[in-house]
Amino acid sequence: MKQLEKLRDRIIQRVDVNLRRFDFDVPGFLKYYVPLNKMIKYYALYGITPHHPLHYQFNYSNLAGSNLLGRCKVDNSILYKCDIRGDELKSSGDVLHYEGTDIPLDYDETILIKDSFLIKTLVHNCSHNPENPELFLIKNTVSSAYVNIHGSWTEGCFLNPFSTVDLTSLHGCAVGTFAYLQVGELWHEQIPPGQIWVKAEDQFDFKYNYPVKVLKKYIDFHPDRRPTGIFIDFLESRKEDFQDVFNVVHFSNPVAVPKSASLSPYAVVKPKTRIADNVLIAQHAYIESSVLGKGANAQEHCYIIDSKLKGNNVTAHGAKLIDVVLENNVFVGFNSFLRGTFEFPLRVGEGVIVMPHTIIDMQASLTIPPGHLVWGLIRKPQDLKEHSIALEDLAKVKDKLNVGAMEFAGNGKAFVDAFRHRIDHILDANGAYYDGKKNRGHAQRTQHIAYNIIQPHPLGVKKGVYPTIDIRS
């Protein structure tokens, strides 16, 4: 495995140089966190569909256990059990709207992952960098487990476990555990664990920080040891179910799936689950004893257990619902963790927006009223007062607002409108509005994917390194 070791050390050197201003042990992390002998245990998959441009290039890389779709190039990188989902990349002729300027695309957009080490990471959406709209770049970057890189350029960055970078370009940044960023662009910043930051220049700025001591109960991470906490225990207890899925070549749906819905063969769906029209269940999702109403979705790394989704519900990448009832048009953001109990299910009212990286962990009855925004840590009914606001009231804010530890500045209506517009776009893109003829989305376009297996060199100095491959239609 000399070539694989050389590749790892090359990535370490490049990322370490970019993060030299921060006190962070990149070599110690990468040499401990994922042993290289695991890199030869798992095959990789690439998908072919009639709806997505096809071009894959893999050069001097390892792709162990990863799933790729769309136009993807991987160069001098290691991807361990990642989802590289290029089904929302821009196409030639599309127009990027940026600060009043229309930027037409001359070529189909491509995801390029170069000199990077990604671990159990989702890469999705498309580039929002106006300087190079045809390229979604991840370079000199390390991401650890259950990270979401969503429409975000990253150069010279380290992304800690369960962090999300969303519609943001990062340059030389370290993002803390369970932090969420949607801020446009950052240079050489260190984001603390548990910071939730949403900012649109000259419009609004939303910020919340989790109490460090409490957050560690859910997810705690140090570079010299594996992550620990409730999130990890929850995921580890269900890991074997996914192993069974990846051991099967010919798939059959475990439950009835309507013609307008899509269930990935690489999702886990347990009995006593019902799926309605226009439902999307992505790879690495886990559904058990639940009902997904018309237009609901479960994106990558979502877990929905003993829950009911009434319809047109967005469960964004990494969100988890246990003993939860969602009324219509509820949005649950990235990596959120919502847990009720069998005796006291958590009820979320119609039109509620659950901010990304929200934790609602209840041992008592709680109903979130319709039309509210919720965020942060809620463990008892009294917490709702300092972690929620009616969207109607937020829309009236024109200057500053503090609710508990949450700080908001700017135009509340612009914030509410931006979220509602994005949620509507997600539902549309996922095919929730499909009427049998119009408004096709992912639920309809990903029903027929041919998956192909590729594997690395099995022996010798190149053991673990995949052959150089160029696949195109």
Residue ranges of each PLM-predicted region?
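Beta-propeller domains
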Residues: 258-289, 293-295, 299-300
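Eukaryote-specific, low-hydrophobicity, charge-rich regions
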Residues: 43-44, 53-58, 237-263, 268-270
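Extracellular beta-rich repeat passengers
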Residues: 41, 46-64, 68-69, 73-78, ...
